[in-house]
UniProtKB/Swiss-Prot annotation:
HAMAP family, A to Z: Ribosomal_uS11
Species annotation: Lactobacillus gasseri (strain ATCC 33323 / DSM 20243 / BCRC 14619 / CIP 102991 / JCM 1131 / KCTC 3163 / NCIMB 11718 / NCTC 13722 / AM63)
UniProt GO BP: translation
GO molecular-function terms, A-Z: rRNA binding; structural constituent of ribosome
Gene Ontology cellular component terms for the protein in this record: ribonucleoprotein complex; ribosome
Function per UniProt: Located on the platform of the 30S subunit, it bridges several disparate RNA helices of the 16S rRNA. Forms part of the Shine-Dalgarno cleft in the 70S ribosome.
Name listed for the protein in its UniProt record: Small ribosomal subunit protein uS11
Keyword Transcription regulation set for record: no
Length: 129
């Protein structure tokens, strides 16, 4: 008996003028997600999804490439203006913002939404190399 073929749902192109670019920059990777104003995903990319492996994922260049890929995909769907919210301590924060601007998106605001603990859990110990 042959396996039943399931119909794949086609991605619907949304026409969105303005949205929010969420840049999550960790020590190991950079994720760029572009949403509409309500928070529904329009486009996303990450350094790992572009083929960077290991320590190369955490570089500013990888963050730049991820931001360019997400911006291109969002601009194909009609995105022109974007607010940027940056989260995390990683190396690719500024590089990703510059790449969004260079790709042709107009940045209207930049917010830093890095969560800061009010003395929560104990942080990881310092590395000794």
């Amino acid at each position: 008996m042959a396996a039943k073929k399931t119909a794949r749902k086609r991605r619907v192109k949304k026409h969105v003028e303005s949205g929010v670019a969420h840049i999550h920059s960790t020590f190991n990777n950079t994720l760029v997600m572009i949403t509409d104003v309500q928070g529904n995903a329009v486009a996303w990319s990450s350094a790992g999804a572009l083929g960077f492996k290991g320590s190369r994922k955490s570089t500013p260049f990888a963050a730049q490439m991820a931001a360019e890929a997400a911006a291109k995909s969002a601009m194909d769907q009609g995105m022109k203006h974007v607010e940027v919210s940056v989260k995390g301590p990683g190396a690719g924060r500024e590089a990703a913002i510059r790449a969004l601007q260079a790709a042709g998106l107009e940045i209207t605001a930049i917010r830093d939404v890095t969560p800061v603990p009010h003395n929560g859990s104990r942080p990881p110990k310092r590395r000794r190399v």
